[in-house]
Structure formats: C-alpha cells, structure tokens
Regions:
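P-loop NTPase Walker
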Residues: 1-38, 186-302, 657, 678
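Extended, charged low-complexity regulatory segments
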Residues: 1-200, 204, 208-212, 696, ...
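Short, hydrophobic/proline-enriched secondary-structure or compact coil segments at domain edges
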Residues: 92-98, 440-449, 584-587
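A structural signal for short, well-ordered beta-strand segments and their strand-loop junctions
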Residues: 95-97, 220, 255, 688-691
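Conserved phosphate/pyrophosphate-binding and hydrolysis machinery centered on Walker-type P-loop NTPases
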Residues: 189, 193, 317, 365, ...
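Conserved phosphate-binding and hydrolysis motifs of nucleotide-dependent enzymes
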Residues: 226-229, 467, 651
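Alpha-helical nucleic-acid-binding subdomain
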Residues: 241-464, 471-479, 487, 495
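Conserved helicase motor core of SF1/SF2 NTP-dependent helicases
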Residues: 246-247, 251, 260-276, 281-288, ...
C-alpha cells in the first residue's frame, strides 16, 4: 500500500480552512445558546422558588411551560454543539460534483457525518442524504440518485476522497475504484478499538444498497465472517432513523444481541452517527420480561460442559422447524379440548354451553384467556338486552370467573405439559427444577403462553434487529414474531453456529420469513488475506472472498507438552506487549477452558519458577495486570489481553488472536471445525495457534513457525 503524497489540491486546503472557520463561529453560537438556555432555566426555577407563595396557579402553569420549553431548547442546543464539535475534528470525507440533465452547470457537494449549513448555505451534506448515495454507488460519468420525488439523472464530473483528523487534512485523492480499495486497505490496517466504529467513509457499493434499503419489511443478511454485517445493520438503522425521522426514533428500535459484551462493543456506532442510543437486550432478558411472575428458567448451558445424552436429545428435538409445526398443530386443536363449556345460569338468566362455545370459537385469533373475557362481555350484554324485568345482572368479572372454572387446564405450564403428553413425546420435557424450565423450553413455553394467555407485545418497538441469527431456533423466531409484529433486520452467518445440538439451517429461516428479502455478503474485510485463506481452508467456505490486504501468515507453534505450551503462550504475550497492537484475544474452545487458562496466566503473581506446577510456569505480577477474562457475566470489552471462549468471542475482533490447544483431541469433530474457523476469523492482523501432541487435522499440512 502506498503512502499518500502531500495534498495535491490547494483549493481543497482553502475550502477546509473556510469550512473550519465557519464551524468555529457556529460553535461559538451554539455554546452561547447552551449558556443562555441554562441561564434562563436557572433564573425561572429561582423565580418560582423565591415567589412560591405569591404566584397564582395560572402564572405557575405558564412558568412550568416555560421551563419545559427552555429545557427542550437547551437540549437541542447541546445536540447541535456536540455535532459541531465532531465536525470540527472531521468535517467531511468526500466531495462529488454533479450536473443534472439539462442543467448547464453542476454543483459541488461535500459529504460528512452530519449536515451543516451556515447562514442558510449548505456546506456539508449528511452521508444518508439521497444525493450522497452517488459517492458510494457511482464512478465518474453517467450517474443518478433516487430521491423521494423520484430518480434524478445526470453526470458525476468529479469524485474526491479525504481523510481529515483533528481538523487537518491528511490526504486528498481523486477517487476511483482502485483508490477506494487503497483507502479501504489503509483504514483496515489500523489497530482495533474497544468499541465498533462507524464505516461511513469506506462503505462499499453492495453494503450501501443494503443500508439504504427502505422497502423490505424484513431484511435478512447472511454474511461471512468479517463481512461487516453487524456494522451494516447498525448503519441501516441510522439511515432509517434519518429517512423516517417523523415516525421512527431511536426508542422505537430494539437490538437483540448474544451477550452484554457484544452489546457494549456495538453500543457506540449509532450515537457516533448522531442518533440516540438504541435499546439492546438478550434473549434471556426478553424472556425474563415475559415470564416474570409466571415461571423461572435456567440460563443456557454450555453444550461442551454437558455430558447428558438425554438433555442433548431434548435440545435437538426443540431446535427443528418440525417442532414449530407440531406446536402449531397443537394450538390449532387446542380450542377443541381446552374449553368445553356447560350452560351458564344466573338466577333467571341462562345461556347454553353451545352458545358460549360458538362465541368462544368466533374469537379464534385471540389467546384463550382473552377469548373468555370477550365471551363474558357478550354474556353480560345479552343478559342486559334480555333484562325486561330490570333484574340484577352479573358483572363480567363474575361471569368470567365461572367461565375460567370450565377450562380443562388452568395455566400455561399445565398446557405445556399437556402438549408433550398429547403429542406422545412426554420424554422430551423435563423440568430443570421446581417451577424452573430448561433453557430449551423457554421459547416453546412462550409460544404456547401466547396462545393461552397472551404475550406482552411491544408496541414501542417498530424495528427489531436480531444479530447472530444462526444461534437461534425456529421456535424462538416464531415466538419473537408474536412479541414483535414489526419490521426486522436479521443477520448472521450459518457458517458460525456454536451449538452442536441445533438442527436448523438458513432454509428454515427462509420458510419462517417467506416474504423477507435475503442478501448475501461474501467478501471479508476484517482479516488479512493470509488469515482468511487459512480460515477458509479450515471450514471449506467456498463463497468467502478475502480482501487483498496482506500481512504475516498464521503461525503454528508445536509444543513439547502442556507446560511448554504455556511457556510459548507467554512468549506470544511478551511479543504482543512489545509491539504496536492494542488487543490480543486468547480464545479457548470452551468457557471452562478459558477460565482455566485465565487462572494459569493471570493467577501466578509472585510465584517463583521452581515453585510452579507443570501447568503453571514462570511469570510475574506485572505481566498479569492487563489480562481480563470475558464470560457471560462480563458487561464490557476493553483493549489489552482478553481470555475468552469461542462462543463469547463471536462478533468481536482483535488485532492479534492466539488459539491455544489447537490439537487433535480438542478440535476433532466437524462442529469443532466450525469453532476453530470462528476463532481464527476474530484476528485482524496476526494469528497464532499453539498445540502439544498432534495438531488438529484442520490445520495439518501448514508449516510451523516460532
């Protein structure tokens, strides 16, 4: 990759100076607005406090309105100030010159993170604006863009790309396909960050088309490791918030992520793009909300730490699409056996069981409990109509109590048990403990709970993002569709599944979301060409296209025994500390193995080498201080050295990755092949694998290093 020369366009330096000067003036005005709003708010509060007993109710009401207005004005001023501060650091990253058809002269547009105008003159256009799409989609020549008013055609006469940092232009280039590729490689060669960053200056054409897709109710993205699918989904949300700002806000979007560490890792992207933070939660937290006061459940178990064949079979059984069909069949038949009413008599009033049943069946789209409430209202209304003698009529809640007594099953747990018994599969349901479900039963239970009692639907959430789609079962998606009847962006990679007991595939998702648009991303950007070619051979991902960013080949480090492997691991750690990279991920196959490795590497403070057991050799307290363990209980991701399992590393990236125990015992099955692939593809710049004994067959034939 070439180093960029001095700025070849003097006019761009002049323009940047002019824009920076106007941003400085705008910042002064914004800060003055913030100070004025703060002062007005404080003065009004003081006046109300000083004259509390003297102000009449009308004046008090007016002052409260003034406080609310001042608060809104101040919040807007703070938002504008913060945006200008960010723009001063990097005002824009691109310029396009565009001449519309039948226009004699073209216009120049600078594209940045936010729009900025000074005294009604637009100086910077938001990257999400319709005209900005030409920077991502078009080369110099015939071009156009789709605006709300329709298609605008013309000619793109110039396209430039910039890197501005701390208000200083580092490079300016006439943009072309080759230059864009060079810029992308330059950006990808940087070290990793503790949080995912926006990619607005390097969005690729195929990515831009997904981001700006506003037509699809549900969009499903199948993307290989490192294809940027999570970042694309977040930028798509930012685009939709911009495009539909009148009816969609950040509080209307929910992200379902695999764990808190990943949620923290992606949490900065949306705010970086000028939007409010998005609400993020896990499948477990969602189940907690739905089942509070109903029933308890155990957390998802690590399948590698379970040695229970019956449990594995139960998990497999409930992970299939056929299981959803079986539950649907039961739900369809449920009205026939769950409610067999008798005549209802109250003093001189009477309705037959047949009439009650007809009314019950008429409300077929509603949960059983809601149907009964509606039938109770119908009975009450009928009694009121027939009440010629003006006798006392039973209230709906009295009628409902009687109708509930006619139910064959009183709660969802009884219904859930009946499902397995009636379907002849009673052995597939085992309680984890008293009134505690196994994790595999949680979403099937919720699915029946929706049919029997009803779920808490989210009317606030208007767009749901589901990441790591391959880790969730068809019944989980079926239950989610009941909870969130809204548009969805679903993303993941079926080449990176982490549960060997899940028996579902991408085609099952196509069946569940038969009207969704499916897109595939096969180009990988995260890792060097050498790392991705290495990973591609492990998992035979033929569709994967590595980015041509070259680096060192992966290192395979043979070790004499476990103690020697620990010594070699510490050598890798010392090399990392002496280098310029900022993050090293040490990725073990299981949570238990990660905990053990953490105890070995971080728990040997002050131990002399001759006092150490075979599996704990040499070290000092200074080495251990920057090592952290990432578990399901962790809440944040930080630079330094992180020890974790494959399942916890998904979605994360590290400058360097070290994979210990890459031997034939640890990575032996086809599923292990997938896990090793996931671990390898977390590395951006450097990958090292250590092993004692025989190396796993998935990496055999590669030359050893170190």
């Amino acid at each position: 990759m070439s180093d960029y020369p001095a700025i070849p366009f003097p006019d761009e330096l002049v323009h940047l100076e002019q824009v920076s000067a106007r941003l400085s003036k705008a910042l002064q005005r914004a800060e003055a607005s913030v100070s004025r709003a703060d002062r007005e708010y404080t003065d009004t509060k003081k006046y109300m406090a000083d004259h509390r007993g003297e102000i009449d109710p009308h004046e008090m009401f007016q002052n409260e309105l003034l406080l609310k207005q001042t608060d809104r004005t101040g919040a807007f001023a703070v938002e504008m100030r913060d945006r200008i501060v960010k723009l001063k650091d990097s005002p824009y990253f691109a310029r396009i010159d565009f001449k519309e058809e039948e226009e004699e002269e073209g216009q120049t547009y600078y594209i940045g993170r936010f729009a900025f105008q000074y005294e009604n003159e637009p100086l910077i256009f938001d990257w999400r604006a319709p005209i900005s799409s030409m920077f991502y989609d078009c080369e110099v020549g015939e071009a156009g863009f789709l605006a709300p008013a329709g298609w605008t055609a013309g000619e793109l006469t110039r396209k430039r790309q910039f890197k501005i940092r701390n208000g200083i232009m580092e490079y300016a280039l006439e943009s072309s396909a080759n230059v864009q590729d060079d810029v992308l490689q330059r950006e990808l060669s940087h070290t990793s960050d503790e949080k995912m960053k926006s990619i607005i200056s390097t969005i690729q054409k195929e990515q831009n088309q997904i981001i700006r897709n506003e037509k699809e109710g549900t969009l499903i993205i199948q993307g290989v490791a490192g294809s940027g699918k999570t970042s694309i989904a977040l930028h798509r949300i930012a685009f939709l918030l911009y495009r539909f700002k009148d009816r969609l806000s950040a509080r209307n979007v929910t992200i379902l992520s695999p764990n808190k560490v990943f949620g923290d890792y992606i949490s900065g992207v949306i705010p970086e793009l000028g939007e409010e933070p998005i609400y993020e939660m896990s499948f477990g937290e969602l189940a907690d909300i739905q089942l509070e006061g109903v029933i308890g459940f155990e957390p998802d178990r690590d399948p590698f730490e379970m040695q229970d064949r019956a449990w594995e079979e139960r998990v497999r059984f409930k992970s299939t699409l056929d299981f959803v069909y079986m539950m649907d069949q039961y739900i369809e038949q449920m009205p026939e056996f769950i409610f067999v009413p008798t005549d209802y008599v109250y003093e001189g009033f009477r309705v037959t069981g047949e009439w009650i049943r007809d009314r019950f069946l008429a409300y077929g789209t509603c949960p059983v409990k809601k149907r009964l409430a509606m039938v109770a209202d119908d009975i009450h209304d009928r009694f009121e109509t027939d009440n010629i003698m003006e006798q006392e009529v039973p209230r709906p809640r009295v009628i409902l109590k009687q109708l509930n007594s006619m139910l064959a099953m009183k709660d969802t747990l009884a219904v859930y048990k009946d499902f397995y018994k009636r379907m002849g599969i009673a052995e597939q349901f085992v309680m984890a403990a008293r009134r505690t479900l196994e994790w595999a039963d949680v979403y099937p239970f919720l699915y029946l709970h929706a049919a029997f009692r009803g779920l808490k639907e989210s009317h606030i959430t208007r767009h749901l993002v589901i990441d790591e789609m391959q880790d969730y079962t068809p019944i989980q998606y079926a239950a989610l569709n009941r909870m969130f009847p809204c548009q969805k962006t679903i993303l993941g990679d079926y080449g990176q599944y982490i549960n060997p007991n899940h028996l579902h595939c991408l085609e099952d998702l196509r069946t569940i979301y038969d009207k969704a648009r499916f897109v595939e991303l096969n180009k990988s950007y995260r890792s060097t060409y050498e790392i991705m070619c290495f990973a591609k051979k492990i998992n035979h991902v033929s569709a994967l296209e590595p980015m041509e960013r070259h680096g060192e080949p992966p290192e395979l480090v043979p070790c004499l025994d476990a103690a020697d492997e620990i010594r070699k691991i510490r050598e890798v750690i010392r090399r990392f500390r002496a280098g310029g990279n900022v993050s090293l991920g040490i990725i073990l196959k299981t949570d238990a193995a990660a905990r053990d490795m953490y105890e070995v590497l971080a728990g040997y403070d002050g131990v002399e080498e001759n006092q150490v057991e075979e599996n704990q050799v040499e070290g000092n307290g200074e080495e251990a201080c920057d090592i952290s363990l990432l578990t399901r209980e962790s809440t944040s991701f930080q630079n330094g050295i992180s020890i974790t399992s494959v399942r916890m590393s998904k979605g994360l990236e590290f400058d360097e990755v070290l994979i210990p125990q890459a031997d034939s015992r640890t990575y032996a099955s086809d599923f292990d092949r997938s896990l090793l692939y996931i671990a390898c593809t977390r590395a951006m710049h450097r990958l090292t694998l250590t092993y004692s004994g025989k190396e796993t067959e998935f990496i055999s034939g590669q030359p050893p290093f170190l």
